[in-house]
């Protein structure tokens, strides 16, 4: 569990562990409320609750619920990439009535603390932070979507997020998973996204960031793409061997 279980306004974190957890259905139902457009990805949340699912060989996964005033109000899904020194933030979301109370930034802080614990568990001294894919406002289909995308980007920036200077395409799903049939995702398409690093205190002190390692960690180890995949090649076309 995170180092701090209680947060602003009486919020409390609960970790969902195991396919038989009584909280797993709660997490999936809340996921559908917060991210209705991603309903096809509920099996991914269920897989992450197992922490070391066979379809996620390179990650140690976490599913957290946020409870406030006896109501489930927030969800966090993220992973430590065991082959690297950083993690991947898949989902962070709150119900409308729980926003604007500091819960989002508190969840980010707890995520960074947990990733440090995970890093030590897997033989490293600390995590440098985690990667997150953020929608680009320029691609929004409506004014409401554009404003929502701008708010998400601003939130991650306020949490110290750095936009990495790479053209990033978000794959539809992790390659070769056993829990989602490709037919279920036939209407989904890869999306151009901002790729951001939310640095930990250790990561913020790094003089340089290894772009190749960060991109490889997400594309090769999380999404399980091949190194010669077009997404990988395009992202690194200007950065092979470079740091920032």
Predicted regions and their residues:
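Short amphipathic alpha-helix that is part of the acyltransferase structural core
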Residues: 1-51, 59, 65
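Short beta-strand micro-motifs in enzyme catalytic cores
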Residues: 62-64, 85-87, 189-196
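Feature marks short, surface-exposed loop/turn motifs that line or immediately flank catalytic pockets
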Residues: 82, 96-98, 138
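Terminal substrate-recognition subdomain of acyl/acetyltransferases
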Residues: 1-19, 120-244
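Conserved beta-strand in the GNAT
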Residues: 65, 70-80, 88-93
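Conserved acetyl-CoA-binding loop-helix of GNAT-fold acetyltransferases
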Residues: 94, 100-119
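Alpha-helix termini
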Residues: 52-57, 113-125
């Amino acid at each position: 569990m995170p180092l701090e279980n209680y947060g602003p306004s009486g919020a409390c974190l609960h970790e969902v562990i195991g396919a038989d957890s009584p909280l797993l259905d709660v997490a999936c139902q809340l996921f559908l409320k917060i991210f209705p457009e991603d309903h096809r990805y509920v099996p991914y949340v269920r897989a992450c609750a197992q922490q070391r699912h066979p379809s996620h060989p390179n990650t140690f996964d976490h599913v957290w619920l946020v409870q406030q005033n006896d109501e489930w109000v927030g969800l966090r899904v993220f992973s430590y990439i065991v082959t690297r020194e950083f993690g991947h933030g898949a989902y962070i979301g709150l119900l409308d009535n729980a926003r604007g109370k500091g819960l989002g930034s508190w969840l980010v802080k707890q995520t960074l603390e947990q990733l440090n614990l995970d890093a030590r568990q897997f033989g490293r001294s600390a995590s440098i932070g985690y990667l997150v894919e953020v929608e680009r406002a320029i691609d929004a289909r409506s004014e409401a979507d554009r404003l929502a995308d701008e708010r998400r980007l601003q939130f991650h920036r306020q949490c110290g997020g750095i936009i990495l200077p790479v053209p990033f395409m978000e794959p539809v799903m992790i390659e070769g998973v056993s829990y989602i049939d490709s037919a279920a995702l036939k209407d989904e398409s890869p999306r151009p996204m901002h790729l951001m690093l939310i640095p930990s205190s250790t990561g913020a002190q790094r003089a340089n960031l290894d772009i190749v390692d960060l991109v490889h960690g997400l594309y090769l180890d999380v999404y399980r793409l091949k190194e010669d995949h077009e997404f990988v090649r395009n992202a690194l076309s200007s950065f092979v061997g470079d740091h920032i």
